């Protein structure tokens, strides 16, 4: 929405590359996108692979955004964005309804991207019926709900943007890709890049914030609107670290135990569907087994419960 950007070109934005490559392109891209009040964190605009100002340069962590948030408080900014060292993921912070700075997680960011893109497509009359979007299997199901309600095809794929790129490639020239992302803070808005990209993602989230402001809302209020319209979702990740050879064996044993003794109940709610991506089979609570349509096996288990929860079990190296 170029008009919304033009009306709010003075919106104060704080950006940090956390000593990484984003410093070369993202501030420039935001200005080219129409935003004239982009502030950077001086101490973190220094290229340094030791990342001296943070414990870890991971934009998923509040600590990595703390200097940017402090600057935002000083200048009364409306949006904070931080890209990871190779500038393919972006972490976001904004003020909540009480004026406190809060982090927006990867699932929430994906929801806002998709909600905005679909809203714009509808307003501009660009929906042709051949659009599709993609999410990874561990990303919130609320994104599918948004797509379904808007009659947009939603595809599931494995974790990693090579799988999203694969879905784009398979439909090239036949269908229109309008967005894809994963819960680990990656999003791809257009198909000219075939990997997660913080440059376009930063421009897009700034545009979403300007559009929300144009409608008398903050980014946080927009998120609440999505929850009111489509339902609430909450996500959390538990990392169980098992280092070394013994750890790898323990992880293997844990996965084998899950397969041999699948849970009947999780969090007090009955498991109604179990998916095993290693065997590419899914089993419902009545014992019916059907195939899962995925390109290859993967060592991931998922359990869907009666109360609408989804639990994913996925080994990754030492975790």
Identify what each model region corresponds to.
Residues 88-106, 143:
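Short Gly/Thr/Asp-enriched flexible loops that form oxyanion-binding sites at enzyme active sites
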Residues 1, 12, 18-27, 69, ...:
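Domain-scale recognition of functional cores that engage charged ligands
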Residues 20-24, 87-91, 164, 187:
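Short glycine/serine/threonine-rich phosphate/pyrophosphate-binding segments
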Residues 73, 77-79, 100-102, 120-315:
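Phosphate-binding and adjacent anionic-ligand microenvironments
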């Amino acid at each position: 929405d170029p008009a919304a950007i033009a009306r709010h070109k003075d919106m104060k934005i704080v950006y940090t590359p956390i000593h990484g490559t984003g410093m070369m392109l993202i501030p420039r891209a935001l200005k080219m996108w129409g935003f004239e009040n982009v502030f950077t964190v001086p101490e973190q605009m220094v290229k340094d692979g030791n990342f001296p100002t943070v414990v870890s340069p991971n934009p998923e962590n509040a600590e990595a955004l703390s200097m940017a948030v402090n600057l935002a408080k000083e200048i009364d900014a409306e949006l904070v964005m931080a890209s990871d060292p190779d500038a393919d993921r972006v972490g976001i912070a904004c003020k909540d309804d009480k004026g406190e700075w809060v982090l927006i997680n990867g699932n929430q960011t994906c929801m806002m991207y998709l909600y905005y893109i679909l809203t714009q497509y509808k307003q501009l009359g660009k929906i042709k019926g051949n659009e599709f979007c993609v999410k990874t299997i561990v990303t919130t199901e609320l994104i599918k709900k948004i797509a379904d309600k808007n009659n947009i095809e939603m595809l599931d794929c494995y974790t990693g943007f090579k799988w999203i790129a694969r879905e784009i490639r398979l439909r090239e020239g036949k269908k229109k890709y309008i967005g894809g992302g994963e819960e680990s803070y990656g999003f791809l808005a257009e198909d000219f890049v075939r990997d997660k990209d913080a440059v376009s993602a930063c421009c897009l989230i700034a545009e979403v914030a300007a559009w929300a402001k144009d409608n008398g809302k903050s980014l946080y209020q927009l998120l609440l609107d999505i929850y009111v319209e489509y339902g609430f979702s909450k996500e959390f990740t538990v990392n169980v670290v098992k280092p070394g050879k013994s750890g790898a064996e323990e992880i293997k044993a844990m996965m084998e135990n899950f397969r041999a003794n699948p849970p009947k109940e999780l969090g007090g709610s009955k498991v109604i569907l179990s998916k095993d991506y290693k065997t590419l089979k899914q089993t419902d609570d009545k014992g019916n087994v059907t195939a899962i349509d995925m390109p290859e096996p993967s060592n991931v288990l998922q359990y869907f419960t009666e109360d609408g929860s989804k639990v994913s079990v996925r080994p990754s190296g030492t975790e």
